[in-house]
Amino acid sequence: MAHHPRWTLSQVTELFEKPLLDLLFEAQQVHRQHFDPRQVQVSTLLSIKTGACPEDCKYCPQSSRYKTGLEAERLMEVEQVLESARKAKAAGSTRFCMGAAWKNPHERDMPYLEQMVQGVKAMGLEACMTLGTLSESQAQRLADAGLDYYNHNLDTSPEFYGNIITTRTYQERLDTLEKVRDAGIKVCSGGIVGLGETVKDRAGLLLQLANLPTPPESVPINMLVKVKGTPLADNDDVDAFDFIRTIAVARIMMPTSYVRLSAGREQMNEQTQAMCFMAGANSIFYGCKLLTTPNPEEDKDLQLFRKLGLNPQQTAVLAGDNEQQQRLEQALMTPDTDEYYNAAAL
């Protein structure tokens, strides 16, 4: 059966051109049809292999091509990863994401990656990984280990992509998403706002995501975190309303997907984050760092949740785990500032 695109570029452009308050109203209506508007899914991201990446993504401090002062590290030991997962669960996260800075995993790494997935799943957490390009067999092995989600961002529109990355094609990214989907793993894929792209490019990114045969279950929208030493370090700041508008359009186009506020939250004030939740964002990364840049401290997130009347969402495997819920609400975790990193760098 042929796949028919759900959206056209002109339709998406019309959404971006709507008056902001009208757009937010529509996005909130769509959101309430599919989600509890007071619940936010909480994830933690750990860099399991940091730095020395051979790719040339211009936004990324982990690329070996740029002098950002980041020290390269080897793949973490399985038990180190699982200890971080235990801390994440104690802090209230329901999904544990593991990211590695490389173009693709080597076969010698696969047994360790499988053990990490199995260990995280044994704790009752959802497991997510972002490891770059996957082969069919690698995707299947991760699926067999129990991986719930695989993150592989498209970053921007096909037209603007070549200005940001030359070491991996757009089609390679789409092919990896297809292999992940075929293996039975849920897809997490989104992009970055602030790369120097136009509004048309933002529309083009969301068009690609929404028109996949099955849209991603999770759509992270990152605000560029400018890191000294990277080619995009001097880019203009992203206008908050432009970012909120992108969140709202993503919610309308992908009504059943989780839309995640990912990298860049440290740069957003409470009012901007609140408007993002109003626009339909319903997932965050929770922890002190996301790959090499700050993320709001846990207690700040909890204070904001209280102000807005939001609640952390539990996964099906954790439903009824009152202890886990209470831990999150009481913010008992001591921040582990050396381990949590920024999602936009993968």
Swiss-Prot record:
Record keyword Transferase present: yes
Enzyme class: transferase
Annotated [4Fe-4S] cluster binding sites: 53, 57, 60
Any one GO BP annotation for this protein: biotin biosynthetic process
Catalytic activity, EC: 2.8.1.6
Annotated catalysed reactions: (4R,5S)-dethiobiotin + (sulfur carrier)-SH + 2 reduced [2Fe-2S]-[ferredoxin] + 2 S-adenosyl-L-methionine = (sulfur carrier)-H + biotin + 2 5'-deoxyadenosine + 2 L-methionine + 2 oxidized [2Fe-2S]-[ferredoxin]
PROSITE patterns assigned to the protein according to its UniProt record, in alphabetical order: RADICAL_SAM (PS51918)
Limits of the Radical SAM core domain: 38-256
GO function term, MF aspect, one: biotin synthase activity
Gene3D superfamilies: Aldolase class I
Matches recorded under Pfam families: BATS, Radical_SAM
TM spans (from-to): none
Pathway connected to this protein: Cofactor biosynthesis; biotin biosynthesis; biotin from 7,8-diaminononanoate: step 2/2
Cofactor: record remark: Binds 1 [4Fe-4S] cluster. The cluster is coordinated with 3 cysteines and an exchangeable S-adenosyl-L-methionine.
NCBIfam families from the UniProt entry: bioB
Family: Belongs to the radical SAM superfamily. Biotin synthase family.
Stated role: Catalyzes the conversion of dethiobiotin (DTB) to biotin by the insertion of a sulfur atom into dethiobiotin via a radical-based mechanism.
Subunit text: Homodimer.
Protein name: Biotin synthase
Organism of derivation: Escherichia fergusonii (strain ATCC 35469 / DSM 13698 / CCUG 18766 / IAM 14443 / JCM 21226 / LMG 7866 / NBRC 102419 / NCTC 12128 / CDC 0568-73)
